[in-house]
């Protein structure tokens, strides 16, 4: 009788783990600053994985650090896509609609 319960727990753990790692999206940005037609993302802007918590050093948009690919989100994820034409310190600028890695 223990075996089915253990199997169920294993399946549930794998399902939760897979769901936590689903890619996400940046859902907000600076309404007045567009990058390739999309609002520029900044620290504090929201994603489906929580807020962006890490941005470019020394580059601010409306008083907030600009978000770039590789920046962290609240749940341990990262921004993983961005502009193909705008770079900050060699990293693509992140924008509303760009992808995140999902939570860790």
Predicted regions: what is each one?
Residues 2-104:
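Intrinsically disordered, low-complexity proline/glycine-rich segments
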